[in-house]
UniProtKB/Swiss-Prot annotation:
Active site: H50, H96
Membership in a protein family: Belongs to the FGAMS family.
Alphabetical UniProt keywords: ATP-binding, Cytoplasm, Ligase, Magnesium, Metal-binding, Nucleotide-binding, Purine biosynthesis
Superkingdom of source: Bacteria
Gene name, Swiss-Prot/TrEMBL: purL
Protein name, UniProt field: Phosphoribosylformylglycinamidine synthase subunit PurL
Catalyzed reaction equations: N(2)-formyl-N(1)-(5-phospho-beta-D-ribosyl)glycinamide + L-glutamine + ATP + H2O = 2-formamido-N(1)-(5-O-phospho-beta-D-ribosyl)acetamidine + L-glutamate + ADP + phosphate + H(+)
Subcellular location: Cytoplasm
Binding site for substrate: S95, H96, N97, H98, R117, Q241, E313, S314, Q315, S535
E.C. numbers: 6.3.5.3
Length: 737
């Protein structure tokens, strides 16, 4: 927007910047005058939902954020958790939803770039990435294009940067037709005594610009991300950033090299709202002012205005407060890596955010009110209405369970994601232990003979729509369960809360109750939230997405040689169900996709049972009793058995308990359950241990033959199951199987 800095501020201009009239009035009272055009843009960026969390902050404060291994919780670029031996894991999940819908390749690519910068800004070398993707209905005309662009963008950036993508999720629903979700997670490893923070310290110290040059790409991106879409979506294309993974790789190496010299006082990546957000956050956290001279900014386009420079979201850039005596060494390092290094300002003691451009002062604002004292709202909310219970006995049984299982395996939500993850380099760096497609990604920890880390991300949006509180609990529980199924002890989590317009009380109610559920589960499971992101206004023409509070977590494995996978079972192993037999069909994919029923409550999450069963499974893995483990979630027992058969290439002969109706036992999505493939010689020890710990076990059958054969219920060969499972995605994307 080419508007002069002294232009009159009109109601139209205020609305264009996403500010409410009362917010603008607050600005006038705060500064005692009309803001300049650049100042208006700065307030718009810092006070929007994306940067200030003004609608969610009250509720986010209720989440558990502390734990025995937590070094740094929310409030920094990423969370930091102790993993022993003087090392820590640094991790976070963030959304890039709106940009990825507008421009899928660059939106997804820069989402990866942004989350990687959050990690190495803290002094950690990125070692793993996962992503949680939600697309519209497969038959929507834009869906295939969006899937192709997003997956290519993620692969293009992460592969070139050199970080393995070790897992993730892909789901489809018509409620994402006009607003897809791209949630990106990254983790890095650092030394505990070498963590770097964004809090500026010291007066009169140099503020340094690092990395790539500034262009006009992404101007207004943070404000765009805090508004719902309408029919003018294509006009927002210039707000999408453009990424360069090779420059980011150089930036990583330069930053880590400089950090090793102990030259860095504070550092912040330029993400949402670019230079504005990074400088304001550094100053506000340190109770310092910041003065910038925009004439010192390296730019790649001519005649850029102060507004454009301050709000550009050009990628691969950092802001740093540097020890003055290290200036020459620091400059030499960044120039060696082909990056810009420019001293663009200084810290001050007056708590003002002052910006100079072409010899004139274009910004002079109170820095605290821009940063950590931005407006916070207690928005009205309506408690979600409870759904009627769908009893399994009231659901008519179908005639052919084998056909139903094949249909689910060949569906958009349950089919193999091989087409997706084979476009990612999952083994770069050489530490990945498990191929994507299982319960969790697992990597070895460098400089440690035995330790490994496990990663998972999870949420079931249809549960959250039916009951946000129970859905929030379930998202945490399934993430915790997936990590446990590898043998890892869950340590901590990060959240990415994706919802619609919080100004609608029913949407705000979804957010409130989901956070309550997440908080309860995290407390009970000792799984604190150490970082996260909130993405609101995920609506198009007033239609909201499904509430999608994604939870990603990290676990520690003491001996990576003991890791088990979904596909590790051996002939003769005994298949055991840990937990109760299936009985709950409400909100299951079986009733949704086979019977076209979308009613009922989601399954209740018994957190005591989750904790007890998860600890038991980790214990038997550590004792070496089992060859394989799998959590039971979407699709219930039948899908879990089929996936173990497909992943191992071996058959299972089993029988049902007949405690519940057959369709409920097969497809019920009751929580807190696992399948394990136990070594025959360990069965008696397993039973003794289960009795001691009061664990419910059901012996289902044995690993034998070349089919999944459930007595008097279904019999499907490994090849039939595999063909159904592997064929949907390539066919959808136009490739032969």
């Amino acid at each position: 927007m080419s508007v002069r800095n002294n232009s009159a501020i009109t109601p139209e201009l205020i609305a264009h910047h996403g500010l409410k009239i009362d917010e603008y009035q607050r600005i006038l009272e705060l500064i005692g005058r009309e803001p300049t055009f650049t100042e208006l843009g700065i307030f718009s960026a810092m006070w929007n939902e994306h940067c200030s969390y003004k609608s969610s902050k009250k509720w986010l404060k209720t989440l558990p954020t502390k734990g025995k291994c937590v070094i740094q919780g929310p409030g920094e670029n990423a969370g930091v958790v102790d993993i022993g031996n003087g090392q820590c894991v640094v991790f976070k999940m963030e959304s890039h939803n709106h940009p990825s819908y507008i421009e899928p390749y660059q939106g997804a690519a820069t989402g990866i770039g942004g989350i990687l910068r959050d990690i190495f800004t803290m002094g950690a070398r990125p070692v793993a990435a996962i992503n949680a993707l939600r697309f519209g209905s497969p038959d929507h005309p834009r869906t295939r294009h969006l899937v192709s662009g997003v997956v290519s963008g993620i692969g293009g950036y992460s592969n070139a940067f050199g970080v393995p993508t070790v897992g993730g999720e892909v789901n489809f629903d018509k409620r994402y037709n006009g607003n897809i979700l791209v949630n990106a997670f990254a983790a890095g490893i650092a030394k505990i005594d070498s963590i770097f923070y964004s809090k500026a310290q010291g007066v009169g110290l140099p503020v340094v610009y690092l990395g790539a040059k500034t262009g006009r790409d992404g101007v207004g991106g943070a404000t765009m991300a805090s508004a719902e879409f309408d029919d003018a979506i294509d006009e927002k294309r210039p707000t999408v950033q453009v990424g360069d993974p090779f420059t980011e790789k150089c930036l990583l190496e330069a930053c880590l090299e400089l950090m090793a010299l102990k030259a860095v006082i504070a550092i912040q990546d330029m993400g949402a709202a670019g230079l504005t957000s990074s400088s304001v956050e550094m100053g506000a956290k340190g109770n310092l002012g910041i003065e910038l001279n925009l004439d010192k900014i390296p730019v790649r386009e001519e005649n850029m205005t102060a507004y454009e420079i301050m709000l550009s979201e050009s990628q691969e850039r950092m802001l740093m407060v540097l020890k003055p005596e290290m200036e020459k060494q620091a400059a030499a390092i960044f120039h060696k890596w082909g990056l810009d290094f420019s001293i663009i300002g200084k810290t001050t003691d007056d708590l003002r955010f002052r910006v100079l451009h072409q010899g004139k002062e274009v910004v002079n604002l109170p820095i605290k009110e821009l940063g950590d004292e931005a407006p916070v709202y207690d928005r009205p909310w309506i408690a979600p209405s409870p759904k009627a219970i769908l009893k399994a006995e009231e659901v008519k049984e179908i005639e052919n369970f084998g056909d139903a299982l094949l249909t689910l395996l060949n569906s958009a939500d349950q089919s193999s994601r091989r087409w997706v993850y084979e476009q990612y380099d999952t083994f770069i760096q050489g530490n990945s232990l498990v191929r994507p497609g299982g319960d969790a990604g697992v990597i070895r920890v460098d400089n440690n003979d035995k330790h490994a880390l496990a990663f998972s991300s999870d949420v079931t949006p249809r549960y959250c729509e039916a009951d946000p509180y129970e859905g929030g609990k379930q998202a945490v529980a399934e993430c915790w369960r997936n990590i446990s199924a590898t043998g890892a002890t869950p340590l901590a989590a990060t959240d990415n809360l994706n919802f619609g317009n919080p100004e609608k009380p029913e949407i705000m109610g979804q957010l409130v109750f989901a956070i309550k559920g997440i908080g309860e589960a995290c407390k009970e499971l000792d799984f604190p939230i150490v970082s996260g992101n909130v993405s609101l206004y995920n609506e198009t023409n007033g239609e909201s997405i499904l509430p999608t509070p994604t939870i990603a977590g990290v676990g520690i494995i003491d001996d990576w040689l003991k890791v088990v996978t979904v596909g590790g079972m051996q002939d003769g192993d005994i298949i055991i169900l840990v937990g109760p037999c299936g009985s709950h069909l409400g909100q299951s994919i079986y009733v949704r996709d086979i019977l076209n029923i979308d009613t009922g409550t989601p399954p209740h999450v018994d957190l005591q049972l989750e904790k007890k069963n998860g600890q038991f499974v980790r214990d038997v893995i550590n004792r070496g009793f089992i060859h394989a483990a799998h959590d039971i979630s979407d699709g219930g027992l039948a899908i879990a058995l089929a996936e173990m058969v497909i992943k191992s290439g071996k058959g299972i002969r089993a029988k049902l308990s007949n405690i519940s109706p057959r369709h409920a036992e097969l497809f019920g999505e009751d929580q807190g359950r696992y399948l394990i493939a136990i070594k025959p010689n360990a069965l008696n020890s397993l039973k003794e241990l289960s009795q001691t710990n009061m664990i419910s076990l059901t012996e289902l059958g044995t690993v034998e033959g070349d089919a999944l054969d459930i007595k008097d219920t279904l019999s499907l060969s490994v090849s039939q199951l595999t063909q159904a499972y592997e064929s949907w995605f390539p066919k959808f994307m136009g490739n032969s199987t």
